[in-house]
Structure formats: C-alpha cells, structure tokens
C-alpha cells in the first residue's frame, strides 16, 4: 500500500524544521519526503494507491499528551480508556499518560496493570502515572520500586497538594534513586479561601475570597528547593502563575 500525502505543512520537532512538502508512505512507513526533488521521477509519476491532499493542514509526528484523565477505572460514566484513546487519536495524539486519580487510585500494581493492559487494546500508546502517596492521603509513600517495575512512568498525586515537606523530600529521594520523575499539584490549601477564582480585583468586588497567587508561589518554591537538595527531577503540573512570576522561583 503506497500513499502520497501532498501539499502538507510538515512540522519536524526532531530537526527543528518547518516546511511544505509531500510525503510518500509505503505499508505504513514513511519512505520519502519530497521537498524539492527527492526522487528521480516527478511526484505526479509516482505510482500510489491513495493520494491525500493536505493543503492547508499540518503534517507532524504523533502528538504526546502527558496529562490526561480517562477516568478509568471508577469514573467511566465520564470517560474510559477506549473512548479517551479514540478521542486522542482523532486529534492526532498517538501517546498519552493517564493520571492516577481513578477509583481505585493507581497506588498498587493491580490497578496499574489494569490501565496498562486495557490501554494495549487501543490504537494508541496509553501509559499511566502512579500515586506518590497511598490513597492520595499524603501520609505514606507507595511502593515506588514495584510501581516502576510495573510500568509507571511518573509519580504524582494529581489534583491533591502534598502538604508534608518530609514526605515530599522522601519521595524525591526515592524517585532520584530510581531515576523517576515526580509531578506536583502546587497549591497550599491552607492559604485559599475559595477555589475557582483568582484572588484580586474581581474576587474582591464579588466578595469572594479567591485563591491568591501566593498559595502557588510557596509550594513551587518549596518543591524547587527540595529538588535542588535531592537532585530529583520534578514537574510543576498545576499552576496559574505567569512565566515571569514563576521564574523568580525556578
């Protein structure tokens, strides 16, 4: 099966290139990118089974979403791995990373294997995060070694801030030992009067307490300092801070 994708605008992140070209695909594998003259015969003379006109469209490698909520297991009335994967594929995403805030939480190898095995039945690559703390309670670490060996790619209590500095430090030390990244939900709930609105002129006018930026500053600063101390790899996955503000702490 030979397919010619014509007139597409190619985005090539690996080579930091962006250009217009035709792509020849043979049996599902790219065999040629025709920008000026990559073949000894004109493009129009190449025998193909299918021609796709991509004029005005972007042609790129499969996109990767490192933070998805497929709600499976436990909340499949919202979404499940099959429907989530289908939606991802329709949008050009060929690889996704599911968060661990399911029911049961992905804090054990059995639930992790459920997600991974069900993901293998879909047309895309479905990976899973695992919880930092058991039950997302922020009190005791999960078995990082077992979860890494089971296929987890990152540890996160997504959606739940970790309040204990000592637990965070312990998690970073273990993650560093295993060469695994951590991802944090950066808000200090003790400093937030009302979720859903930033603390500022509008919240004051509406007489709603709001969530001040400082509730995020302090958590980002804390975790960056602990990461510097432990040499752990971390990601700030949830923040509303502006780049120039966050930069003061990163």
What are these regions (language model features)?
Residues 239-246:
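Conserved small/polar residues in nucleotide/adenosyl-binding loops
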Residues 160-184, 188, 211-215, 219:
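Metal-dependent enolase-superfamily TIM-barrel catalytic cores that perform enediolate-based chemistry
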Residues 1-45:
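N-terminal metal-binding scaffold of metallo-dependent hydrolase/deaminase domains
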Residues 91-93, 116-125, 187-230:
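Active-site gating loops and adjacent loop-to-helix segments of metal-dependent hydrolytic enzymes
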Residues 108-112, 116, 137-145, 192-198:
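Distinct, well-ordered alpha-helical segments
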């Amino acid at each position: 099966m030979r397919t010619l994708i014509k007139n597409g605008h190619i985005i090539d992140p690996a080579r930091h290139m962006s250009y217009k070209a035709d792509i020849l695909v043979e049996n599902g594998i790219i065999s040629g990118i025709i920008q000026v003259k990559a073949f000894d015969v004109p493009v129009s003379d190449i025998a193909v089974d299918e021609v796709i006109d991509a004029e005005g469209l972007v042609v790129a490698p499969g996109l990767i979403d490192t933070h998805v909520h497929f709600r499976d297991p436990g909340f499949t009335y919202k979404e499940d791995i099959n429907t989530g994967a289908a939606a991802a594929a329709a949008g050009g995403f060929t690889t996704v990373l599911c968060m661990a805030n399911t029911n049961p939480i992905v804090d054990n190898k059995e639930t992790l294997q459920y997600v991974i095995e069900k993901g293998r039945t879909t047309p895309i690559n479905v990976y899973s995060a695992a919880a930092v703390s058991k039950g997302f309670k922020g009190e005791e670490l999960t078995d990082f070694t077992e979860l890494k060996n089971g296929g987890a790619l990152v540890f996160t209590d997504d959606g739940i801030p970790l309040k204990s500095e000592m637990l965070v430090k312990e998690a970073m030390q273990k993650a560093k030992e295993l060469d695994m990244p951590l991802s944090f939900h950066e808000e200090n709930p003790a400093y937030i009067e009302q979720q859903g609105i930033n603390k500022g002129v509008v919240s004051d006018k509406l007489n709603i307490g709001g969530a001040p930026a400082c509730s995020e500053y302090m958590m980002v600063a804390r975790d960056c300092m602990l990461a510097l101390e432990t040499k752990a790899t971390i990601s700030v996955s949830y923040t509303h801070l502006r780049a120039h503000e966050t930069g003061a702490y990163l």
